[in-house]
Amino acid sequence: MIRSSIKNKITTTKSLSCISLINRQYGTSTKEVRETFLNYFEKNGHKRLPSGSLLPYNDNSLLFTNAGMVQFKNQFTGNEESKYKKVTTSQKCVRAGGKHNDLDNVGYTARHHTFFEMLGNFSFGGYNHFKRDSIQHAWDLLTKEYGLPKERLAISVLEGDEESAEIWRNQIGLPNDKIMYKGREDNFWSMGDGPGPCGPCSEIFWDHGKEVDGERYLEIWNLVFMQYNKSGKEGDEMPVDKLPIPCVDTGMGLERMASVLQGKFTNYDIDLFQNLINSFKEIVTMDVGRAQFQLQQDPQRVETAYRVIADHLRSISFLISDGVIPFNIGRGYVLRKIIRRALSYGKILGFNGPFLSTLFPLLEREMGDIYPQLIERSNEIRNVILNEEGTFYNAIQRGIPYLEEFVQQNKLNEESLFLLYNTYGLPLEMSQVKAKQNNIEIDMDKVNKLIDETREQSRLTWNTSSSSSDQTTQQTTQLPEKTFLSWKSDNIKPKFIGYNGCVENDNSKVLRSHFDNDSHLVYLSLDETPFYGTSGGQVGDVGELINVSSGKNVYRVINTIKPYEGGLVLVVEWDPSQQLASQVYQDLKQDSLLNCRVDRSIRNQVAVHHSATHLLHAALRNVIGKSVVQAGSLVGSESLRFDFTHGQKLTPNQIEQIEQWVNDAIAKDIALNTDEIPYEQASKNSDTLQLFSEKYSELVRVVSIPGFSKELCGGTHVERSSSIHQFKIISESSVAAGTRRIEAVAGLAATNFFKNHYQLVHQLSNSINSPIVNFQQSFERLVNTNSKQEKEIFDLKLKIAQLSSVNYNGQYKSDNGGEMIPLSLHIIDCEDKKAFTKVTENFAKEFSSSPIQLTISKGGKVLCQLLSSSSSSSSSLSADTVLKQLFKSIGMGKGGGNKLMANASIQPLNNEILNSILNWSNVNNNYNNKKN
């Protein structure tokens, strides 16, 4: 029996030498490994379920799904009952960012990935004996289905878990020298540091054999026996309670298992990765210049680059397909970081421009049959990648001159690295390499701290700016989270009865109530209610409650929320000037009977905007293409907001087509259909739109407008399309790279929109003394007249500026060896920005023989601009540097720019300031001896 930690023995090997353990090229393909696993458990009574989204549903504790059990978290905790007692899945996982972050290791180790698939089987009380059955299943699959030699397998158990050890020894027949004991750090699993299900685990290892140099054992499967509930805090020695029903959670890395079955020592040598990498190599070597460049690089560095790009292309594509868009915070920031890391490694292969988007079809070909959303969202994925590539290379082009300047001035430090990253978007890796090349030490912890502080501030600002809500649902008080957790634990799940136009219900019973006297709010859960809770982008209902017994006190429902899955809570406001707290308590306490009255007019307008949102979504996909994916929405009574993936601003013609498409559907007076069908059935219909970031129940509601739209939706809608009346887009804008936003109005809100605009046009017509029918012609005449007058004024300003100009020939003394460079100095009397810019352009042409052109206005608000000719005798000459030298000499100035142009301001000119400028410019003649 082995009772040592063997921490150094049982690890993922770091060696890159490939030893053929099973003498075949690939043998079992990765697809066959996946299918064999799922099919085995299906044959043994498990329900095969699709992979969950990479975006954990309603779980802010995780950036991304990083394990197979994430989508079953509520079943493990007991907060949700599973329809199936035994389940098997192949789960998409991403580990990049947050606690589980493999990003920096990817490409350098044998098995680290940002994206991988986790094969798993799960039992929620479905096994006769949870340990015995799960161990037997694992052994049979490995030795009989996969055909692995028994003598090449070893296992570990938790020290003290003799029950598991006995099963391996007596039931499976594993010899003692193959059973290894490990501590809680390695063989006890929990969902986190806080309360939750947990238990010992048994890991299964593939033995590479003693002849392998370096580490010997590779973990291929982890069997977790969740039999306890941890109710203590972090640091507790042992769990305190047994779960009423022990569960099983197992995880096997697909790529890792494929490497064993294919006799490969690293995951990157399996068929899936080699197919991608070899295709990449063909593309790279098609360009002679790139091929020659690659031959000059370190071969190991080149191979690492191929691995990084192959891995990152997978995580990038799957994240985008699940709705993540590159952004500056949160999940979008991680995606952006992965894309930029891949592009940085592309430079090693000779790529100096976008290339990732052209590689995506290779992944689509390799994995599209298993994950059809790669095919369905192909255009969107490629467009998002291409847009981000453009952003990246623009950032490099913008930031490199500043990086070079910081190096030349010995100012490359933590603050300047942060500035280059935060202001100009230059990747940290590029600045780090430059620092290393110049023997400059950088404290990256300090840089990362600056980034984290800025990101947190951005997150707070973003949360504030993106949390706009309908006026009927504004909630400014702190919600009683502990109360809601208690209600959730007590399984308080009200029944919603508000479909089919139902807005009233008598004798609803109060199941739970929470009184907040400070805010004069009461939170109620009723047994059944017509009030719809905020979800799916739709705002919650408002209305009134009346106590059945008293029949007189009316309470205003200001919001309806869903604080937990299955929960439905009415937020009720009471007026202390009109109602006594004791009476409120008596009327709304537990077991009270209430008459519910939803505000019908607001409900109807919300329904109008929700149905209009479905038509808008369909119209976008019809006009722009199937690559459009919903990225967010807000449906209120006054308007709707719809965010969608698209890399370009919509043209006026596209907006007009979208509006016309929606209004045509409205005019056809189509009856809406709602059906409840199994999710499995709905998900197989490619015409039915769904959000991959949403978690759907076994039974889903399908809302369809025949011939136009079909979506999974739990919201309220109109009965016929004609009830929407009319639809109008009021704005289209960008909310992030690759994400656009449309704001629109429908129904009564659209009528009011047109009414208000008519009144505005009427007022404007009166102000220019024109009949409203002739307003357009009158307005155009007014605009034309104004344009002519503005041009005349501009020409006069330009003429005055040119006539007043005082021009000097001077010299600039550079820092580089004191070289004297010709300089033209121009003093003008011009405060108009447009005229000032035009004058400087004229000077640049007229005095082109001088590499440096310096123009300064002298009156009022001062503008200073520096133009630097590209024909300069000094390649290191920078307009920004020249300007800063001027500031230093005259003791004032604020501004900056780049190598070719810089803008600034100083104090209004007087003789003293002017003479200081002339002295710095090495001009011999003074102000009175000007040279025109």
From Swiss-Prot:
Q: Name one GO cellular component term.
A: mitochondrion
Annotated Low complexity bias = 464-478
List the Pfam families. Answer: tRNA-synt_2c, tRNA_SAD
Q: What is its EC number?
A: 6.1.1.7
Per its record, the protein catalyses: tRNA(Ala) + L-alanine + ATP = L-alanyl-tRNA(Ala) + AMP + diphosphate
The record ties this protein, via SUPFAM superfamilies, to: Class II aaRS and biotin synthetases (SSF55681), Putative anticodon-binding domain of alanyl-tRNA synthetase (AlaRS) (SSF101353), ThrRS/AlaRS common domain (SSF55186), Translation proteins (SSF50447)
Keyword annotations for this protein, in alphabetical order, are: Aminoacyl-tRNA synthetase, ATP-binding, Ligase, Metal-binding, Mitochondrion, Nucleotide-binding, Protein biosynthesis, RNA-binding, tRNA-binding, Zinc
Q: Which GO terms describe its molecular function?
A: alanine-tRNA ligase activity; aminoacyl-tRNA deacylase activity; ATP binding; tRNA binding; zinc ion binding
For this protein, the record's InterPro entries field holds:
aa-tRNA-synth_II/BPL/LPL, Ala-tRNA-lgiase_IIc, Ala-tRNA-ligase_IIc_anticod-bd, Ala-tRNA-synth_IIc_core, Ala-tRNA-synth_IIc_N, Ala-tRNA_ligase, Ala_tRNA_ligase_euk/bac, Thr/Ala-tRNA-synth_IIc_edit
What is the UniProt remark on how the cofactor binds and its stoichiometry? Binds 1 zinc ion per subunit.
Give the protein's cofactors. Zn(2+)
Top-tier EC class: ligase
Q: Which SMART domains match?
A: tRNA_SAD
Q: Segment Disordered: which positions?
A: 458-480
Record's domain comment?
A: Consists of three domains; the N-terminal catalytic domain, the editing domain and the C-terminal C-Ala domain. The editing domain removes incorrectly charged amino acids, while the C-Ala domain, along with tRNA(Ala), serves as a bridge to cooperatively bring together the editing and aminoacylation centers thus stimulating deacylation of misacylated tRNAs.
Role description = Catalyzes the attachment of alanine to tRNA(Ala) in a two-step reaction: alanine is first activated by ATP to form Ala-AMP and then transferred to the acceptor end of tRNA(Ala). Also edits incorrectly charged tRNA(Ala) via its editing domain.
Q: Which HAMAP family match?
A: Ala_tRNA_synth_B
Task: Outline the subunit composition.
Answer: Monomer.
Protein family membership: Belongs to the class-II aminoacyl-tRNA synthetase family.
**Listed name of the protein:** Alanine--tRNA ligase, mitochondrial
Q: Which organism is it from?
A: Dictyostelium discoideum
The protein's gene is named malaS
